[in-house]
């Protein structure tokens, strides 16, 4: 089980790097990472 707070943190980091416009790409990236992790 993933901790909700942990998920929020992982999402906020890429957004800070790529800016608000990168939130969609960040979501795809995180989804890919989670899929690979599982």
Swiss-Prot record:
Its main location: mitochondrion. One of its GO terms (cellular component) is mitochondrial inner membrane. Keywords: ATP synthesis, Hydrogen ion transport, Ion transport, Membrane, Mitochondrion, Mitochondrion inner membrane, Transport. Mitochondrial membrane ATP synthase (F(1)F(0) ATP synthase or Complex V) produces ATP from ADP in the presence of a proton gradient across the membrane which is generated by electron transport complexes of the respiratory chain. F-type ATPases consist of two structural domains, F(1) - containing the extramembraneous catalytic core and F(0) - containing the membrane proton channel, linked together by a central stalk and a peripheral stalk. During catalysis, ATP synthesis in the catalytic domain of F(1) is coupled via a rotary mechanism of the central stalk subunits to proton translocation. F-type ATPases have 2 components, CF(1) - the catalytic core - and CF(0) - the membrane proton channel. CF(1) has five subunits: alpha(3), beta(3), gamma(1), delta(1), epsilon(1). CF(0) has three main subunits: a, b and c. Belongs to the ATPase delta chain family. This is ATP synthase subunit O, mitochondrial. It comes from Pisum sativum.
């Amino acid at each position: 089980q993933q901790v909700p707070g942990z998920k929020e943190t992982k999402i906020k980091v890429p957004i800070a790097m790529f800016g608000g416009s990168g939130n969609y790409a960040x979501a795809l990236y995180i989804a890919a990472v989670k899929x690979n992790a599982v």
